[in-house]
């Protein structure tokens, strides 16, 4: 399951008002899928959440930038680096073949400003 840090951490870290409805919806999806982990495991199915920061080059980042000029630059400065689509896609692909973390979560990019 691919999500954003802004959605994954929505309960502990506020996000931009423009993104909050999306973040809450994505978190609800993540929670619903996490509830199924025991049943999936019984069937031999692995599950991992891949959470990434704002991804440069996506329509979501572009729309957030239009609604909140400077959002991408501000997040890049705070995180030190933002992944582009190809870089994040490579991380998602790795999540499919590498061992599943014990908490079923692969965090891609800086999370120091999320709690």
Q: Which sequence ranges carry the predicted segments?
A:
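C-terminal helical subdomain
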Residues: 43-53, 64-115
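Catalytic loop of short-chain dehydrogenase/reductase
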Residues: 1-42, 54-58, 64-67
């Amino acid at each position: 399951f691919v999500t954003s840090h802004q959605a994954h951490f929505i309960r502990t870290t506020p996000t931009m008002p423009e993104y909050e409805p999306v973040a809450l919806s994505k978190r609800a999806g993540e929670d619903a899928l996490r509830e199924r982990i025991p049943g999936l495991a019984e069937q031999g199915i692995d599950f991992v959440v891949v959470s990434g920061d704002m991804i440069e080059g996506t329509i979501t980042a572009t729309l957030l930038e239009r609604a909140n000029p400077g959002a991408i630059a501000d997040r890049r400065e705070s995180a030190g680096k933002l992944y582009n689509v190809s870089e994040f896609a490579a991380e998602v692909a790795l999540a499919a073949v590498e061992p599943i973390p014990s908490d079923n979560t692969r965090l891609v990019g800086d999370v120091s400003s999320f709690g």
